[in-house]
Amino acid sequence: MHKLIIHGGTPLKGSINISGAKNAVLPIMAASILTDKLHITNVPKLTDVSTMKDLLRSHGADIEIIEHQDEFELIIDTKNINNFTADYEIVRKMRASIWVLGPLLTKYGKAKVSLPGGCAIGARQVDLHIAVLKAMGAEIEIEDGYINASSKGRLKGTHFVFDKVSVGATINAILAAVLAEGETVLFNCGREPEIVDLCNCLITMGADIAGIGTSEITIKGKDSLNKASYKVLSDRIEAGTYMFAAAITKGDVKICRIDYHIVKNIALKLIETGIKVVPINNGVQVTYEGKLNSVDLETNPYPGFATDLQAQFMSLMTLSSGVSMITENIFENRFMHVPELCRMGADIVVRGNKAVVRGVEMLKGAEVMASDLRASVSLILAGLSTSSKTVLHRIYHLDRGFQDLEKKLSNCGADIKRV
């Protein structure tokens, strides 16, 4: 099994190009079921993308892959979909597999999807996915670990209030509603840029969607959608991770190919800590200027601070000048990186959904183990900050969400190798 060996202590200097957003491309790939052909560009080279390709192919899709140096193009032909079951062997690898449920059900009137897998960071129940589809007229039962869904005729437009903000359920509801009969109004929706990107792709395909980027989305169902071509937006989580990498290594890095407005809340949080962050053409520049203040943080649905960056921010705060409180409001069990950071000398105490981080002068290299995707990259950041050797095990998590991570960091001076 592969591992990463990191010899830290070198400030990162240079530029990093951001890849396409994993959390946007996966639902867009699922949306291909709604039409006959979808051409997607700026697709990141990630194992989660490969898993979604395998899933779509298992349903009968034909996928042409055009490989470029930094990205894929995908041409997905779904006119011959003939299998409506998403099997456990594929779905267990990735929670995003649940997003084929809405498209299969709304276009073909039936779907059988295994309960999903992915990172072990909490329950992430599918209750809201099921509730909104039932509100559209679907008949759904959970049997033997599968969601069995069917509808008599087309799904029907509905008014539905999510009792809590759910990115995943918002996506499934939108994917189902675009081909439902009549108007669907969704309240308390997720507002994430990746949801906006999905909606923009669906509009390119001929969907009628209003309220994009707000908590109230109105969808007028169509009889069918068109072939389309769409470029996926860049990954704000990857961008934020490298912004924190620049800060924790006391470096100076230009983060390129990212719109500043979708990382603005990350930039503002870094500025609070004393890091210099300025917008540049098609990106942002992050520069350490000699201090790192302790800052409290709460994760919240967008436009709040993303839970997917909480672990990376915690790594940064382990070296701050005071005490910070980090509150995780999205997922339970998302402090699994804390024991590993403490092995490296961090002073962190977890109390429920809060972590108290007391800054230390320096971290020390150690052998550590990744528990999930975001935890793994937080340990890399910690390793980059030390003047000694860190060995990270179970790095297969990284390849689910970060393209060419070692290469991008090495190009900025990091000593990081996969063995």
Curated annotation (Swiss-Prot):
Catalytic activity reported: phosphoenolpyruvate + UDP-N-acetyl-alpha-D-glucosamine = UDP-N-acetyl-3-O-(1-carboxyvinyl)-alpha-D-glucosamine + phosphate
CDD domains cross-referenced by the UniProt entry: UdpNAET
Pfam families reported in the protein's UniProt record: EPSP_synthase
GO MF annotation terms: UDP-N-acetylglucosamine 1-carboxyvinyltransferase activity
Active site: C119 (proton donor)
Binding of UDP-N-acetyl-alpha-D-glucosamine, residues: R95, K164, V165, S166, V167, D308, I330
Domain of life: Bacteria
Keywords linked to the UniProt accession: Cell cycle, Cell division, Cell shape, Cell wall biogenesis/degradation, Cytoplasm, Peptidoglycan synthesis, Pyruvate, Transferase
Purpose: Cell wall formation. Adds enolpyruvyl to UDP-N-acetylglucosamine.
Stated name of the protein: UDP-N-acetylglucosamine 1-carboxyvinyltransferase
Upper taxonomic lineage: Bacteria, Pseudomonadati, Pseudomonadota, Alphaproteobacteria, Rickettsiales
Gene, per the UniProt record: murA
